[in-house]
Amino acid sequence: MYGLIGKMMAVSGQRDALTAILLEGTSDMPGCLSYIIAEDTTDANAIWITEVWDTEANHKASLGLPAVQAAIAKARPLIAGFGERFITTPLGGVGLLTGKQ
């Protein structure tokens, strides 16, 4: 499996609008096992994105999907910048089917 955890900063006061866009059109991404958008509790403009994919290749391919491209274009003006980004190897857990159970 392939995992990503990243911090995104919204333009001041635009976090709700940005999170709404990031949640649009993300329900049909082949290979995506988990896609979670979370608000940072200590920074009113920060968002954490946690993704789990079956393969890195499917993650990369998802960036070319029309719905994802549309969301990126719509979100771009609301993004002030990016913070930490971590690549992980998810092993499993509650809500994540790994095929190993």
Residue ranges of model-derived segments:
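Short S/T/G/P-rich N-terminal loop/turn motif that feeds into the first structured element of a domain
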Residues: 1-47, 52-66, 80-101
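Short, conserved catalytic or adaptor-binding loops enriched in Gly and charged residues
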Residues: 75-79
